[in-house]
Structure formats: C-alpha cells, structure tokens
Amino acid sequence: MVNWAAVVDDFYQELFKAHPEYQNKFGFKGVALGSLKGNAAYKTQAGKTVDYINAAIGGSADAAGLASRHKGRNVGSAEFHNAKACLAKACSAHGAPDLGHAIDDILSHL
C-alpha cells in the first residue's frame, strides 16, 4: 500500500528545491524545507493534496475546480507542468503509480 503522505512530502520537497519561488504562493512561504512537516499551513496543504490524489485515483477529482482556484492565484500551466515532473519523481521513489493523468486533467482546464 502506498503511503501518499510520504509521496506528497517528497513531492513538495522536490518542487520547492527545483522551483523555490513556488513556495511564496503558499501560507508557509519562508519556512525552511526541513521544517515544513512541523508547519500547520503546510500540514493543511499536504492533507488537501493527499485528499485530491485519493479523489483522482477514485475517479471523483474536481480538476476543473482545482484549476479555477489555482488560476485565481496566478498559477498556470507552466507551474503544473513542473509539478507533474516533480510528482512523477516522488511517485517513482515510493513505488506509487504515476499520477500524470491527474495533472493532465487539471491542465486541460487551464
């Protein structure tokens, strides 16, 4: 069984190492990467990400809604393409299935 919380933690570590400016779009901006797991805002975001992954796996994810919310935060296709690459690395590291289709669904609404 996949530990999606661990996948998500590795995803965000990978994403913020590759694109540190992305962390500024979150409520935990300026928090050291090594301290993220102890930050309440990060825990909330990571939990939402795990919930979305579970919904995507179950076929009930609201890709249009997620895309719409992110557009309002000036997050577009470039960021999601970069996130897709980081998510693929995190999934691979944990033996998890590739979730590229979930990102593609979001991208189709941007």
From Swiss-Prot:
GO terms for molecular function: heme binding; metal ion binding; oxygen binding; oxygen carrier activity. InterPro entries: Globin, Globin-like_sf, Globin/Proto, Mb-like_M. Keywords: Heme, Iron, Metal-binding, Oxygen transport, Transport. CDD domains: Mb-like (cd01040). Disulfide bonds: none annotated. Heme binds at H70. Residues 2-110 form the Globin domain. Gene3D superfamilies: Globins (1.10.490.10). Belongs to the globin family. Acts as an oxygen store capable of sustaining neuronal activity in an anoxic environment for 5 to 30 minutes. Homotetramer. Self-associates in the deoxy state. Seems to dissociate upon oxygenation. This is Neural hemoglobin. The lineage of its organism: Eukaryota, Metazoa, Spiralia, Lophotrochozoa, Nemertea.
